[in-house]
Amino acid sequence: ATEKNPEIKARLFDFDSTYLETPFLKSIKLRIYSDVKNAKFNIRFYSVGENGQPDKPIYEKNIIGISKKGTKNLEIDLSDLNINFPDTGLFVSYEWLIIEENEFKISFPIKDSKKRIEKTLYEPKVGLLPITQNTNSWLYKNGKWEKVERFKGNSPKPYLDNYGILAIELILTN
């Protein structure tokens, strides 16, 4: 989930010569967690820029996914879109949509106090995999792309002091 600022998290998939046999994206699989029903998110595909960051959109239209409430493995069919896997690699990105139907209000206690903090989050959450080195995960926030930083503070194991990359699987076809 994210707070009131739009965010896009992106993961790089490097090209492999075996993809020449199945060069088109057939579908994408994600692990989604949502506290609201029918939460919407956007999938985007980007080329790889000169500095290794996400660059230009590969597919211009929004690919809207809808998540039911709870934890789900979700597959989105891309076969009608004719998206070719570029030989320079491909960023797959997950965009949180800051819209009313994605709002989730949460309240939690302040340490050593009787007061509580109220926050509005925007669902759904996307699954992340912990990795020790960040070679391919980026975050678009406040108008620019930045490498994802290590999880800090009260992050649960196995994420603490590691990086999180999108838990995404791409299925290719010819």
Describe the role of every protein-language-model region.
Residues A1-V48, E95-W96, E100-N174:
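Beta-sheet-rich sandwich/jelly-roll-like modules and their strand-loop junctions
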Residues K40-R116:
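Aromatic- and Gly/Pro-enriched, solvent-exposed loop/edge beta-strand patches characteristic
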